[in-house]
Structures are given as structure tokens and as C-alpha cells.
Regions:
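A phosphate-binding catalytic loop at a beta-strand-loop-alpha-helix junction
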Residues: 20, 28-60, 253
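Generic long, charged, amphipathic alpha-helical segments
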Residues: 203-230
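Long hydrophobic segments that form regular secondary structure
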Residues: 16-18, 22-23, 29-33, 138-155, ...
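Intrinsic disorder and flexible/low-complexity segments
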Residues: 251-333
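A conserved beta-strand->alpha-helix junction
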Residues: 62, 66-122, 128, 154, ...
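Secondary-structure transition/capping motifs at alpha-helix termini
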Residues: 27-34, 55-67, 77, 87-99, ...
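Single conserved hydrophobic/aromatic residue that forms the stacking wall/gate
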Residues: 2-13, 332-340
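Active-site adenylate/phosphate-handling loop in enzymes that bind or generate adenylated species
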Residues: 57, 92, 116-194, 213
Length: 340
């Protein structure tokens, strides 16, 4: 629906954006930093990070030219995301720099003896870490700060490259779930942008979510769709909320999800992705144990300095064992069990 017609939601979105922006403003002022460096991809997360950084610079009275947007195309970059990244940077009045990383990544593959035709985790993470190295070095060049783009959903699932996009100097999206990222970007587009910028932002909202680390298909379209690989974010964000905020066990989360998403996902699909959620949430904790600073936006956070302190070698066996037993609707669960 048209978010401009929902004043209540608009107030919520504005508060959430303000928390992110004022958090970054405080860090910029504390460090006397006049420059920010962002890897801009044309995807949702880097777009929200850029919008937040623009707001923070405006609040500080710093010229937007101090926001250095770096686009780093490689094997999987599509025209759609590249063009949106370039257009949005120019529309917002930020500085743009393009660094094609293909040559550097190929040299790296040659150095370590990796076949470029083998599209495995080494192939993907090599690109992500090359990008992070560039951002960090440009931050040194400009006396700037690398702004992290990863969101809460990605961190919960470990859908980030360790010491790649996982790392920054201040992560503005770390407590914002992916489903909310999309709504925030759309709200800004509908309420706070001129016509050209609005069109760019709405196209970004409608672009399939992808890290673009695998080459595009024969038509130049995104081949690597994140939700095909790890599952729908609306399910994972649902699981995450009721697991962290309410402390519910897998059977109750399954019960609630089966009814909430009835007609959208059948129970076998929900069970499949619930298993993925618990497996990944536990075995990816090591990435969350060393997260950069960032603001807490909503009611849950997985910062090791805040809401969530968990050993990296914690076992998921008990939770996964319960997921395996799920086969019927859990009507025996007490209806009065609610969030505290």
C-alpha cells in the first residue's frame, strides 16, 4: 500500500531512521571525522546505509561530498544494480569512485592457485574481501570511516563474508532486519525524495536480493538469488523475533509461523527453513562475536556488547532435534503463552 497514507507507520520509520542517523552523527563528532566511505552496490542494504549517512552528514553540517561511494564491479555485477548505484550517488550529491576489481581478484586467484571457473566459497569470498580491503584503504586515504551495510537478518544467518562485508568501522544496519530495510528505503523514496531519486530507490526496492558474486545469466540478469539459497527473509525475520525477543522454542515458533503464513507457505516449507535458521544461527555465531559498533534500532539486537552474548561453539543439537520432530500443527500449545 502507499506508505504516504500511513502516518503511524511513517512516524515509526522516521524514528528508526533517526536512531541510525543520530548514532552515526555521534560517532562522526566523537572522532572528528569529516569523511565516510561506503561500498555501494545498488542493493537494499548499501542503499539504506547511504541514506542514513546522508542524513547524518546533514545533521553534522558536513558537505555530502565527504561521503565517498565506491562501486566495485566484478564477475556478478549486473547493469541494473551498477546503474542504480551510480545514479543514486549522483542524485544525492555524494562523491563517486569506480574501481573494477576483476584484475585484482584474478591476480589473487592466481596467487593462491584457485581456478576461476570453480564458483565455490573461495571464489565468492575472494571478491568480498577484496572490496573490504579497498574500502579500508580509501578510508585511510581520506581520514574517513568505513560505514557497514550488513543487516540484522544477514548477521543472524551468517550471510556475510568473515572479515569481508562483515567488517566495517561503524555498522548502521546491524539491528535492522531485511524486511524492515525494504520498508525504510521505500518510505524514504515516497516521502523524502525528488522524482528522479524516488524512481531509482523504488527500482532498488524491486531488485531481487543478491550478493552478485556469481556471474549473471545469459541475459545479463541476476543468477544468484539469496532467498532461493537461504530462504525467505519474511520467514527468517519471523523466526528471529520470536526466538530472540520471546525466547520461544522451535515447536511454538513453528506453530505460530504455520498460522501466520497459512496459504503462503505450507508446513513442510516452514519446517525446512526453520531448520536452516537454527543451524545457521548457531554455527555462524563466531561472526557475531566480533561485530563493529552500531546503533540498536529495534527491540532486539545480536551485538556481543548488548543483548546477545553467546559462545561461538554453542551446539544447536537440541533445537534441531526438536525441529526434526515437527510434523503436525501444535494445537496443544497453551494459547496464553505470549511474549514477556
Amino acid at each position: 500500500r502507499d506508505l504516504r497514507m500511513s502516518r503511524g507507520l511513517g512516524d515509526v520509520y522516521k524514528r528508526q531512521l533517526n536512531i541510525q542517523s543520530y548514532g552515526l552523527k555521534k560517532r562522526l563528532e566523537h572522532t572528528n571525522c569529516k569523511n565516510a566511505v561506503i561500498g555501494i552496490s545498488g542493493g537494499l542494504d548499501s542503499t539504506l546505509a547511504l541514506l542514513v549517512t546522508v542524513r547524518a552528514f546533514d545533521l553534522c553540517g558536513i558537505d555530502r561530498s565527504g561521503i565517498h561511494c565506491i562501486t566495485m564491479p566484478c564477475f556478478g555485477t549486473t547493469d541494473r544494480t551498477y546503474n542504480n548505484a551510480v545514479k543514486l550517488t549522483k542524485q544525492l550529491g555524494c562523491s563517486l569512485r569506480e574501481i573494477n576489481i576483476m584484475k585484482a581478484v584474478r591476480q589473487h586467484f592466481e596467487d593462491i592457485g584457485h581456478n576461476e571457473d570453480v564458483h565455490n566459497v573461495t571464489y565468492e569470498n575472494g571478491q568480498a574481501r577484496e572490496r573490504t580491503q579497498i574500502l579500508m584503504d580509501i578510508a585511510n586515504q581520506t581520514w574517513g570511516m568505513v560505514i557497514g551495510t550488513g543487516d540484522l537478518s544477514e548477521l543472524a544467518l551468517g550471510w556475510a563474508t568473515y572479515n569481508g562485508d562483515h567488517m566495517s568501522m561503524y555498522g548502521v544496519n546491524g539491528s535492522v532486519p531485511k524486511t524492515l530495510v525494504k520498508h525504510l528505503v521505500k518510505w524514504v523514496a515516497e516521502n523524502d525524495m525528488d522524482e528522479a531519486s524516488r524512481a531509482t530507490l523504488l527500482d532498488i526496492v524491486n531488485t531481487p536480493i543478491s550478493p552478485e558474486l556469481i556471474p549473471a545469466d545469459e541475459n545479463g540478469n541476476i543468477r544468484q538469488i539469496t532467498e532461493d539459497l537461504v530462504g525467505p527473509y519474511e520467514l527468517h525475520d519471523f523466526f528471529l523475533y520470536y526466538f530472540l525477543r520471546c525466547g520461544f522454542r522451535p515447536s511454538k515458533i513453528f506453530f505460530l509461523a504455520s498460522r501466520t503464513f497459512k496459504g503462503t507457505y505450507d508446513e513442510e516449507i516452514i519446517k525446512k527453513w526453520l531448520k536452516t535458521f537454527f543451524r545457521r544461527f548457531f554455527n555462524q555465531q563466531f561472526k557475531r562475536s566480533c561485530l563493529p559498533d552500531g546503533p540498536k534500532v529495534g527491540s532486539i539486537s545480536i551485538s556481543p556488547r548488548g543483548d546477545w552474548r553467546m559462545p561461538s561453539d554453542a551446539s544447536s543439537e537440541m533445537w534441531l532435534r526438536e525441529v526434526e520432530t515437527l510434523s503436525v500443527s501444535y494445537t496443544h500449545l497453551r494459547a496464553h503463552e505470549t511474549c514477556a
